[in-house]
Amino acid sequence: MSVSNTGAAPRPQGRALRIGICGFFIECNRWSPVTTREGFADALDISGAALGAELAREQPRLLPDCAGFAAAMKAAGPWQPVPLRMAVAQPGGPVDQGYFDELVADIEARLRAAAPLDAVFISSHGAALTTECDDPDGLLFARIRAVVGPDMPIVAVFDLHTNVSMAMTKALSAFVAYRTNPHTDLRACGEEAARHLHTLLAHGPGVVECVKLPFVPPATAQLVAPGTPYAELIALGQTRVGGPILNVSLCGGFALADCDKCGFAVVVTARDGDRRAAKTLALELANTVWAMRGRFVSLLTPLAQAVHAAVVAGRPGGEPLILADVADNPGAGGGGNTVMLLVALVTAGAQGVLLGVFTDPELAQEAHAAGVGAAFTARFNRHSADPQFALPYSHDARVLALSDGVFVGQRGMVKGSTLSMGPSALLELGGVRVAVISIRQQLLDPAQLEVLGVDLATVRTLVVKSRGHFRAAFDTFAPPGRILEVDCPGLTTPNLKTLPWTRMPRPVYPLDEDAVWSAG
């Protein structure tokens, strides 16, 4: 499939550029609970002056691509940000349709009221679903395009796990996806989007071409690190940037959305309306991706083997270890509250273990009511909404520390961002400490543990509810060879063949190993 769009506007003379700023950012897992209005309110849902104030903050609550875009625009010359609306939620289930309809209508109204504009910047994940629509990202972009007209530049930044659709690329003038995983280049991508916007304003239309492949690599196989196939492909794509080619984005996609736009996408943006150059390169790179598909393999460690490794790590002389509970990753729609690994570690008597972060608002509230030093029976998942995976578990515990959960990211993906876990508590269950939080999220930064008084030097095994983003922030705790991705059940399992697919286009590799594709 090949899709394209053009868009251009003359550069204004003698005045500041007026750039509309908006965003809709969520990654949706088909099998996770519906994401409601409250899910966005817990993370970020602001508009107008409030959004403008965040853009101006040194440590904004916004995603770093927004800060990077704003900084690059300011450095390039006079500009006036026109804040519209920014809605961000933790990865979860399909978005409530009523909320999404209201969001789109609000952005449309704000766009009309903001006229005249010179361009629009969108901060997007690109893998959203709603309860009634499998391509809300494309719908939103199309509605924005309809308001501003065919010639105004619209530039957007995406997660590299975006599920790209024709409607998405058709509405855009430039497409920029992250090139790191863990995602540490959000700010740089925002800066790049600003450069492309200036290029399009000065030189004319941008062209976006996309080639989709019947290939859904597991999330754990999409690590961008030395020696990985994804790193090789992204590096190859970057060698082709230059001349008419503004950007090459290689998007592995998010299979757990289970929708017809799932699949690896090669997206190329070219300047000067050079559609031929963009399409030719997209097809060439797609051929290379397809030839390398067999190298995207997920390597999981059996639970018993992982627990044994933790027991050994807790003995004198044991080396630090990270166990990644990848099947319960809040960063892909997991609840962050499965207990299989926790129970196994406690039962085995493992020492020096810290599990972070476990989402259980009721348990956090009870710990706050009890106070530091209190001993009580910790009842995990007492009112679980996920009886399949988030099973109840009770154990004697002691409250070690309490916090309001507000932290400023220090390293990796959320460095410099002010975020909140809500009321949080550090509990001790024998040799296992558990960081319990109220607002669901994955472990991304040491600050999430340090606000609870944790000294990582006292930890022998760190259990993370995360798929991979922790690697960018905890690289000094344990080297890659001491990270085990544990094979447990959960909503975000990378064992794709175990999932009840209903909307995934078939055949698709690796679900169907005989899937075929040709550039012709």
Give a label for each model feature.
Residues T220-G430, A435-I439:
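Hard-cation-handling environments
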Residues L201-P229:
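Internal, active-site/partner-interface "lid" segment
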Residues W290, F407-G520:
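Extended hydrophobic packing segments that form well-structured cores
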Residues P10-A16, A75-G77, P83, A109-D118, ...:
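Glycine-rich phosphate/diphosphate-binding loops that line cofactor/substrate pockets in enzymes
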